[in-house]
Amino acid sequence: MTLIHMNILMAFSMSLVGLLMYRSHLMSALLCLEGMMLSLFVLATLTILSSHFTLANMMPIILLVFAACEAAIGLALLVMVSNTYGTDYVQSLNLLQC
């Protein structure tokens, strides 16, 4: 395992730990999810480039599309919760309320 792969896995692990520690605030959770997606993108790109597997060249692009969709939905949810409740607590996202 090269130093680059170890750094990427460390970034993913730190984002995962951040997600577990700061899960009460929606903004912190979204930032940690973005860090996880970015490290997965870099890891997938490096893996495909090092293995010379040409059929999987679209996988990092597809991962970026899903990350952009996740970010857009997350920011829309953050704006809605902030306007409705005045805070960005995840506890405000109770789906049983109408």
Curated annotation (Swiss-Prot):
Task: Write out the entry's keywords from A to Z.
Answer: Electron transport, Membrane, Mitochondrion, Mitochondrion inner membrane, NAD, Respiratory chain, Translocase, Transmembrane, Transmembrane helix, Transport, Ubiquinone
Q: Which Pfam families has this protein been placed in?
A: Oxidored_q2
Similarity comment: Belongs to the complex I subunit 4L family.
Q: How does it sit in the membrane?
A: Multi-pass membrane protein
| Keyword Transmembrane (UniProt) | yes
InterPro entries from the UniProt entry: NADH_UbQ_OxRdtase_chain4L/K (IPR001133), NUOK/Mnh_C1-like (IPR039428)
Q: Which GO terms describe its molecular function?
A: NADH dehydrogenase (ubiquinone) activity
Q: Name one GO biological process term.
A: ATP synthesis coupled electron transport
Record localization:
Mitochondrion inner membrane
Q: Keyword Ion transport on this protein? A: no
Top-level taxon of the source organism: Eukaryota
- Which EC class does it fall in? translocase
Protein name, entry field: NADH-ubiquinone oxidoreductase chain 4L
Per the annotation, which location comes first and is thus the protein's main one? Answer: mitochondrion
Catalytic activity from the UniProt record = a ubiquinone + NADH + 5 H(+)(in) = a ubiquinol + NAD(+) + 4 H(+)(out)
Assembly behavior:
Core subunit of respiratory chain NADH dehydrogenase (Complex I) which is composed of 45 different subunits.
Q: What EC number(s) would the UniProt record show?
A: 7.1.1.2
Q: What does this protein do?
A: Core subunit of the mitochondrial membrane respiratory chain NADH dehydrogenase (Complex I) which catalyzes electron transfer from NADH through the respiratory chain, using ubiquinone as an electron acceptor. Part of the enzyme membrane arm which is embedded in the lipid bilayer and involved in proton translocation.
Q: Name one GO cellular component term.
A: respiratory chain complex I
List where the protein spans the membrane: 1-21, 29-49, 61-81
